[in-house]
């Protein structure tokens, strides 16, 4: 998509090969705001609970994913997968969270970047949270990030919600 996706909710299951996401496969520019996905998502390259990939000037704001993500690894492919976004290379990610587990099957001779929140990250993340089967939130990170695991002790869901709301207010969203 190159457009605007707002206030949507997706359930069920989604499967594919490349650019597989609960809401959108690839968001190239435009924005995704206020969307959620409880869908189970299965794919091979760039796989995520909300978006398989964000790119160019795409923004992701106030979104969340609760469905499980399965990455079926192709031995000859580079792999990026996360509970929220597989490959995050848009212009910003603000106040989003993910709770679905991320699992993978197989092995690859290419890179395998799998995280509890994002597979690959190439942009600024502000107030991003995850809680699932992964200790590492981002498989490969090229930018500073505000991605934090909710552990229930130091970081509770209440603290996470408060921080996401504050970030949205500060951004004027």
Place the predicted regions along the sequence by residue:
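Predominantly extracellular beta-rich ligand-binding scaffolds that present long acidic/polar faces
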Residues: 1-173
